Amino acid sequence: MTAIFKREVRSSFHGMIGYVLTAFMLAATAIYFVALNLGYGLTDFGYYTLYRTTFVLLLYIPVLTMRSFAEERRTRTDQLLLTSPVSVWEIVLGKFFALCVIFALPCLADAVMILVLAALGATGTATLANLAALLCYYLMGCAAIAIGVFLSSLTENQIIAAVAGVAALLLAYMMPSLRSMFTAGSAVALALFTAIAAVLSVVAGLRTRSFTLGCLTFAGCCVVLTALFLLQSSWLTEAFSAVLSGLCLFTPFEEFVNNSFSISTLVYYLTVTMLFLFFTAQGLEKRRWN
């Protein structure tokens, strides 16, 4: 894993991509920091700077992660990785940690800005709140990186990986607005969960190479969903809302910086990170055995 980690970091800064992305993030953060925190004397770095620059991640993260596995597949060097005496998890974590280190560079600069505010008179409580917001911001970025790495593992084209990453993060960014549009009843919720059941059934059938198991899985899910629709439709509606809330990747950070410091927010980002790393590892494991 160490060798993969070093190679990934080295390759990012061997060309211009690592420097350009870091400078891009620093420039975006510095603009808000100078204009709001220094210009108006505002000590809340989390809300006035970090939260207002989350939209930058919609472009930064996909460009950062697009090469992670797509380039390996294009050059066929992924075959060397998959046949090397290292586990799939070591490959995934080596690349993931390397990207997290690159993302940590602008975050370290953000920490310096927080210390500047402390030197200019920000209270100890405000400084701790700013550092907590920075930690949450970093974990949110790591979750987005995990999503980008997963999407990159699905294709050998970097452009497709980047576009898919932008689309996925843009959907998550706009989900609060979309959620307010989908004040749907139980019928729409039933349709959504039926579609999810169909996808899961296909995956189960492919993983086990059993068409019968896939059909039985889908039939069982349909029976359960129909029973809930007829007997307790409110559960479907509540679950529908919960699913949409879970897709709002940036909303927990907004709530976190609005004086709602919750451990559940940090756990949410860690869970999203582990989930997509697991998806990536499973995909690579399947390709290794094929």
Which positions does each model-derived feature cover?
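Residues that define the loop-to-transmembrane-helix transition and helix capping
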Residues: 19, 89, 158-159, 264
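Secretory targeting signals
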Residues: 29-36, 40-56, 98-165, 173-184
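Alpha-helical transmembrane segments of polytopic membrane proteins
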Residues: 51-55, 133-140, 186-196, 215-218, ...
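Helix-loop-helix units of permease transmembrane domains in multi-pass membrane transporters
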Residues: 68-100
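Transmembrane helix segments
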Residues: 158-255
